[in-house]
């Protein structure tokens, strides 16, 4: 329903951010990983989101990357894992590391998340081990083009926006820095 939020970061708190989108302020629950990716209040931020509708509330969950959102949705599909537990897991480590832990059946690592015991961690491994999508090159730890990120930041984009654009496949394929900048600007341009 609400697939993304792009606006001015109003406040960062433990587990949530407030984002002003043209006069409407959204409270978006996030993982610690996403909180670290976001800038400071006043910066323009962009989050991919998932809206959960309950009888008594609407809860918006936001993530810095599509990979983090996909892993969040996969974790929600596991019996006994709710949104809070999924966020706690995503706060432990980056999505690629969590995926490695699940595939490697590292139950002790998963059980370190608040609210996730060994029994739930075992269930996560059992249900997701073979279902998680393959990691992309960037998720697997390929370095981000820091020169491109710095150039985009010099043009006024936030660190988060610059990193997201730098990881786009079209941008990564461009041979020279100038061509990567042009490709990144195409990705960052409003639709």
Curated annotation (Swiss-Prot):
Protein family per UniProt: Belongs to the RuvA family.
Gene behind the chain: ruvA
Subunit note: Homotetramer. Forms an RuvA(8)-RuvB(12)-Holliday junction (HJ) complex. HJ DNA is sandwiched between 2 RuvA tetramers; dsDNA enters through RuvA and exits via RuvB. An RuvB hexamer assembles on each DNA strand where it exits the tetramer. Each RuvB hexamer is contacted by two RuvA subunits (via domain III) on 2 adjacent RuvB subunits; this complex drives branch migration. In the full resolvosome a probable DNA-RuvA(4)-RuvB(12)-RuvC(2) complex forms which resolves the HJ.
Region (Domain III): 140-191
GO cellular component term of the entry, any: cytoplasm
Keywords: Cytoplasm, DNA damage, DNA recombination, DNA repair, DNA-binding
Pfam families tied to this protein: HHH_5, RuvA_C, RuvA_N
Segments of this protein annotated with the region Domain I: 1-64
Record's comment describing the protein's domains: Has three domains with a flexible linker between the domains II and III and assumes an 'L' shape. Domain III is highly mobile and contacts RuvB.
Location within or outside the cell: Cytoplasm
Record region (Flexible linker): 136-139
Xref: SUPFAM superfamilies: DNA helicase RuvA subunit, C-terminal domain (SSF46929), Nucleic acid-binding proteins (SSF50249), RuvA domain 2-like (SSF47781)
Name used for this protein in its record: Holliday junction branch migration complex subunit RuvA
UniProt xrefs under InterPro entries: DNA_helicase_Holl-junc_RuvA_I (IPR013849), Hlx-hairpin-Hlx_DNA-bd_motif (IPR003583), NA-bd_OB-fold (IPR012340), RuvA (IPR000085), RuvA_2-like (IPR010994), RuvA_C (IPR011114), RuvA_C_sf (IPR036267)
Gene Ontology biological-process annotations: DNA recombination; DNA repair
GO molecular function list: ATP binding; four-way junction DNA binding; four-way junction helicase activity
Functional description taken from the UniProt entry: The RuvA-RuvB-RuvC complex processes Holliday junction (HJ) DNA during genetic recombination and DNA repair, while the RuvA-RuvB complex plays an important role in the rescue of blocked DNA replication forks via replication fork reversal (RFR). RuvA specifically binds to HJ cruciform DNA, conferring on it an open structure. The RuvB hexamer acts as an ATP-dependent pump, pulling dsDNA into and through the RuvAB complex. HJ branch migration allows RuvC to scan DNA until it finds its consensus sequence, where it cleaves and resolves the cruciform DNA.
Region ranges (Domain II): 65-136
Superkingdom field: Bacteria
Source organism of this protein record: Thermomicrobium roseum (strain ATCC 27502 / DSM 5159 / P-2)
């Amino acid at each position: 329903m609400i697939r993304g939020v792009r606006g001015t970061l109003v406040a960062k708190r433990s587990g949530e951010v407030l984002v002003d989108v043209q006069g409407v302020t959204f409270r978006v629950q996030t993982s610690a990983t996403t909180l670290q990716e976001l800038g400071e209040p006043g910066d323009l931020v962009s989050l991919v989101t998932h809206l959960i509708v309950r009888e008594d509330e609407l809860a918006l969950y936001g993530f810095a990357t599509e990979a983090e959102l996909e892993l969040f949705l996969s974790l929600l599909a596991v019996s006994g894992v709710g949104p809070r537990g999924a966020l706690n897991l995503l706060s432990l480590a980056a999505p690629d590391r969590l995926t490695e832990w699940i595939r490697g059946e590292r139950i002790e690592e998963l059980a370190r998340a608040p609210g996730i015991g060994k029994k739930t961690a075992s269930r996560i491994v059992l249900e997701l081990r073979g279902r998680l999508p393959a990691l992309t090159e960037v998720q697997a730890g390929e370095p981000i083009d820091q020169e491109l990120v710095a150039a985009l930041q010099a043009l006024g984009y936030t660190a988060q926006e610059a990193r997201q654009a730098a990881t786009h496949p079209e941008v990564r394929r461009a041979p020279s820095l100038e061509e990567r900048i042009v490709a990144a600007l195409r990705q960052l341009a409003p639709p």
